[in-house]
Amino acid sequence: MSSVLIVLGHGSRNPAATAQFMELVEHLRSARHEPVLPAFMELAEPGLDAAVEEAVATGATEIVVQPCFLFDG
């Protein structure tokens, strides 16, 4: 089974908030053996639909979506 973790942020027009979120995603990537993809609900890309499509295209048989609403923005 191939598992992919999608970390779902709210999204922001503030580049600093998006950068903080992406730092978290990079940290998770370095700590896990399975792929980790970012996604946003709005105001930033990629959206959740695009992240799911990417996961499926890479052969994922399990997709876990973890909401992460920690950053101001």
Q: Where is each model-derived feature located?
A:
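Active-site-proximal alpha-helix that buttresses catalytic centers in soluble enzyme cores
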Residues: 1-73
